[in-house]
Amino acid sequence: MEERILTQNFTQEDATEYSLRPRWLSEYIGQEKIKQELKIYIEAAKKRGEPLDHVLLYGPPGLGKTTLATVISNEMGVGIKITSGPAIERSGDLAAILTNLQENDILFIDEIHRLNRSVEEILYPAMEDFELDIVIGKGPSARSIRLSLPKFTLIGATTRAALMTSPLRSRFGVINRLDYYSVEELKEIIKRSANILNIGIDEDAAFEIARRSRGTPRIANRLLKRVRDFAEVKGNGYIDYNTANIALNMLGVDEMGLEEIDRKILIAIIEKFGGGPVGIDAIAASVGEDGDTIEDMYEPYLMQIGFLNRTPRGRVVTKLAYQYLKYPYVEQRRIEDV
């Protein structure tokens, strides 16, 4: 049971992704405030010989929550078990994981907001008292027994912290929000990844890829690898500014980092719904995309760059987006856009 929940097939692509991940806080680029706090918490926990307090990491996808969890395990010198909320279907699944942890180990649960409520309730005594309540038998003869667990650290990650229940969220002693990365930080990440992958790249090319990476390291590394493919097939393998610019344009990634689906979302709201306000379900139906995907993957960045507002009545495209997409903007439409 535990094997199914904790492991996946390890592909060559996974190996490449893993090689790009920093292993220590000193190698981790960006999120400076979080790193400084974690250094203190980790050093204090190690001095006391205790596990690190439970940690909740939240923010848009691709910002390094899983990577940061593995960095914490390395800094603490302990093992880490990685799973996800949807993978833990029954309380028995979680019990199997918890009882197989070693002292001071880290349990990382991605998408923790998607935990089954009955599973979540098993976590409460485990997080607070390092004890596990299990029920043996059924019906009138059923009885509950309490097992002692090794002390451990739970690191939860979520893109939608608002969907977590208050009892679960309140049990985390350390709560950090990961923010989008600056272009300069992404440029350093791209240069580091290029060095690991033996890719030749100049400063201007690294900056151009970073500029179009939506503030997200995962996207920056993905674009770097696709530009590398272009450079190897259409050029001499070296990535200069011209090569990067042509490749990114071919990929449909514009100067703001917008891709086809971003433009479809904005244009659909403008052309079909008068610029908004409009609900997420209507947007999803009009562009043929899942509503949760739009909320998790596309909407946060569009809001971050000021192209989309979320109001009580729905989503509204801003004047800035109208100007960028070269659509005429009618002022009286945008009473909500202030």
Swiss-Prot record:
Renumbered residue ranges of the record's region Head domain (RuvB-H): 255-338
Classification via InterPro entries: AAA+_ATPase, AAA_lid_4, DNA_helicase_Holl-junc_RuvB, P-loop_NTPase, RuvB-like_N, RuvB_C, WH-like_DNA-bd_sf, WH_DNA-bd_sf
Residues bound to ATP: L20, R21, G62, K65, T66, T67, E128, D129, F130, R171, Y181, R218
GO molecular function list: ATP binding; ATP hydrolysis activity; four-way junction DNA binding; four-way junction helicase activity
Protein residues bound to Mg(2+): T66
This protein's record includes keyword Nuclease: no
Reactions that this protein is recorded to catalyse: ATP + H2O = ADP + phosphate + H(+)
Keywords recorded for this protein, A-Z: ATP-binding, Cytoplasm, DNA damage, DNA recombination, DNA repair, DNA-binding, Hydrolase, Nucleotide-binding
A Gene Ontology term for the protein's cellular component: Holliday junction resolvase complex
Principal location: cytoplasm
Binding residues for DNA: R310, R315
Chain segments carrying region Small ATPAse domain (RuvB-S): 182-252
E.C. code: 3.6.4.-
Top-level class of the enzyme under EC nomenclature: hydrolase
Annotated CDD domains: AAA
Metal-binding in keyword set: no
Protein's GO biological process: DNA recombination; DNA repair
Subunit structure comment from the entry: Homohexamer. Forms an RuvA(8)-RuvB(12)-Holliday junction (HJ) complex. HJ DNA is sandwiched between 2 RuvA tetramers; dsDNA enters through RuvA and exits via RuvB. An RuvB hexamer assembles on each DNA strand where it exits the tetramer. Each RuvB hexamer is contacted by two RuvA subunits (via domain III) on 2 adjacent RuvB subunits; this complex drives branch migration. In the full resolvosome a probable DNA-RuvA(4)-RuvB(12)-RuvC(2) complex forms which resolves the HJ.
Function: The RuvA-RuvB-RuvC complex processes Holliday junction (HJ) DNA during genetic recombination and DNA repair, while the RuvA-RuvB complex plays an important role in the rescue of blocked DNA replication forks via replication fork reversal (RFR). RuvA specifically binds to HJ cruciform DNA, conferring on it an open structure. The RuvB hexamer acts as an ATP-dependent pump, pulling dsDNA into and through the RuvAB complex. RuvB forms 2 homohexamers on either side of HJ DNA bound by 1 or 2 RuvA tetramers; 4 subunits per hexamer contact DNA at a time.
Family: Belongs to the RuvB family.
Name this polypeptide is given: Holliday junction branch migration complex subunit RuvB
Organism in which the protein naturally occurs: Caldanaerobacter subterraneus subsp. tengcongensis (strain DSM 15242 / JCM 11007 / NBRC 100824 / MB4)
